Every structure is written in structure tokens, then in C-alpha cells.
Amino acid sequence: MKIVGAEVFVTCPGRNFVTLKITTEDGITGLGDATLNGRELPVASYLTDHLCPQLIGRDARRIEDIWQFFYKGAYWRRGPVTMSAISAVDMALWDIKAKAANMPLYQLLGGASREGVMVYCHTTGHTIDDVLEDYARHKEQGFKAIRVQCGVPGMKTTYGMAKGKGLAYEPATKGQWPEEQLWSTEKYLDFTPKLFDAVRNTFGFNEHLLHDMHHRLTPIEAARFGKGIEDYRLFWMEDPTPAENQACFRLIRQHTVTPIAVGEVFNSIWDCKQLIEEQLIDYIRTTLTHAGGITGMRRIADFASLYQVRTGSHGPSDLSPVCMAAALHFDLWVPNFGVQEFMGYSEQMLEVFPHNWTFEGGYMHPGDKPGLGIEFDEKLAAKYPYDPAYLPVARLEDGTLWNW
């Protein structure tokens, strides 16, 4: 099954996505997502200039060999740009293999391990009352797992806070320069438990409650925070501190039983190894688009299962619907599944990427169409050219650059 074509598309139907399409001599096509928020063009260039020319003439069935060739053959291994490009190739090849076998990807992986994929949504607001209103709306829609983020009094903006009432959270800003946001750890630590208290007092403990700290705290601050919120029984606290120094998670673990989720910025199993091996986390957040595609994520999930660490993959709308389709197949199959992030997509985005997934009662299903069950409208995508946008940076109130 020889590869005869590999094309890269950068489109912005509301936000920028990088899509790879691989075509075989049999006319079978596969799609892969290579989106890296704020760094889309470097990934597109890496694919166009390096990987795509070396795909032509290869056997599309040799997925593992192609993965190893691009990973080991480049010498400069890992990193978000390289791994996003490899991920897209891998995703597209699995799409092709499943289509050739005339079965949905989850069946090719080994079949369903569950009836549906539990997904968590995002609730947000400038005030606690706004968050409670948004929470009620998502609860009514049937979500069983809900992330809560809120504006902090005394801070103009913070991570997870939508720009307007009823709007989805969108961190990236258009233009050639990232927005700078002020951050106060003290104000955050003082306020956030009040948010959890209001949610639990209003809605009880029927839904799983999640919260993203987005790398903002030091290890001892995260330990104190996690211990102080134990009565609210969070499903997880996400990215409490930057994960470059993974040993620091031992300090957090020693002081709290609040579950920890980490890994959305990881690119390979090596990034995950220590945290999983020492059981310093409960959920691994790596995503198909940034950690080597289906092939890379299988290695991570299999390794995590040895230590009873479950998956909780990153999945906001800054990853394209192609990634979401692939993730739902992976989630339906993987034995040690925990939860899947899902923000949803605009109608405009889904017109460019017609999909086959369904949502009902807090659970999603990828559908039974052969392959990933996702398509790409190239003509419509061409009407939405790339539009520069960047994630913000954070500074402390004294001007010190901080972790966004």
C-alpha cells in the first residue's frame, strides 16, 4: 500500500489548525492533526520540508517502522515541533490502516473496553455566581465531570476565565505579540477554595469536580493548596507546578491525597516516566497530537497501567477535530482510561471537519465509520487562511516573568 501523496493544510476556521492528509496508491486517504497552539507554522514547515517528502513511496502499513524512522532518524529527538509532526503522520497512517480493514479504529486497536467515553467540560466566569450559572447549564446537558475556573478578585484576568459571559474560554490572542497577564499566587490561594465550597454547597457531590492550576504554584504552595481542598473531593488538580523538575512532586504527594493530573505539555514516554514510575500522579494528560500519535500514546498508557495511573488526555479546541476523533477511538479502547477533556467546537469548525462522533449523557462515542470517522473539506478550509495568534505570558505583580 504505497504512499503517493502527503499534503499539509493550515487553516483558521475560528482558530488555527494544522492538518496532514496522506494518500495511498489505492486511493485511501488518512488525516492527522499536527496543531501546536501558537507554533503552527514551524510544525507545518517541519512536515512539508522534512517528513512529507520522505513518506512518498513508503508502505503505509508499516506504521511502527515509519514512526521509528522519523523519531530516530532525525537525531534531534523529541520536542513539541518534532513530535507534533510525527503524531500527525502516525494518526493518518492509523486512519488509513483502519479504513483498509473496513473497521473503526477502536476495533483495530482491540475493541471497546467500555460503552462510552466520559468527557469533562469547562465552566468559567468572572464571578462565582457566573460559574454556578455556567455549571448548571453544563449539568443540564448531562456532563458527569466538570472543570471549574473563575476570575480572582483583584486580578484583571486569569487562566480559564472566558472573555465574556456565555463564551467559551479562548486563551490565545490575535496578533504578532502575546498578551501579558498579571498573576498573584496569594490572591488565587485565598479565593479558589471559596469557589469549590460554593459549587459543592450548591450542587453537591454528584459530578466529578476538576480544576486546572496551570503550572502557577511552587511545590510547597501546591502541597498546601491540595491539602486544604481535600474536603471538596476533587477528581483532580491539574498541573499544580511546572513538571520539568519531576522530583518536586514528591513534596506535593507527601502532603495531600487530592489526585494529581499532569502531562499536557509532554511529548514522549520519557517525559512521563519518573512521575508514573514513582506514582507521583494519578492521571497522565498526554495527547495524541503532541506525544507521538496512537503509537506513542499506546506506549505511555501501557506503561502507566502498570502503576494504576489512568489517562486523562488534553483535548481543548486548540487541538483540531481530527485529534478529538482519534482520541475518542483511543479512549474507547484503552483499558486504563480515566476521562477525556472536551470543550466542543464551533459550527464553523465542524463544517470544515465533518465528524461522526456522538454525545449523550456525559459520554461520547466515536461512531463506527471505518477509520477515524472524520473528514476534511479542503475547499472550505481554504476560505479560512492562517491568522497569527499566541498564548499569553504571565508576570507577577512586581513584573517578574512567571509560568503561564
Swiss-Prot record:
* Active site, UniProt feature: 159, 214
Q: Which reaction does it catalyse?
A: D-mannonate = 2-dehydro-3-deoxy-D-gluconate + H2O
Pfam assignment, any one = MR_MLE_C
* Gene3D superfamilies per record: Enolase-like C-terminal domain (3.20.20.120), Enolase-like, N-terminal domain (3.30.390.10)
Annotated binding of substrate, by residue: 37, 122, 264, 285, 314, 318, 341
InterPro entries xrefs: D-mannonate_dehydratase-like (IPR034589), D-mannonate_dehydratase_GalD (IPR053379), DgoD-like (IPR034593), Enolase-like_C_sf (IPR036849), Enolase-like_N (IPR029017), Enolase_C-like (IPR029065), Mandel_Rmase/mucon_lact_enz_CS (IPR018110), Mandelate_racemase_C (IPR013342)
Known cofactor(s): Mg(2+)
Top EC class for this record: lyase
Does the entry feature the keyword Hydrolase, yes or no? Answer: no
Chain positions recorded as Mg(2+) binding sites:
212, 238, 264
Q: How is the cofactor bound?
A: Binds 1 Mg(2+) ion per subunit.
Task: Please report the name of this protein according to its UniProt entry.
Answer: D-galactonate dehydratase family member RspA
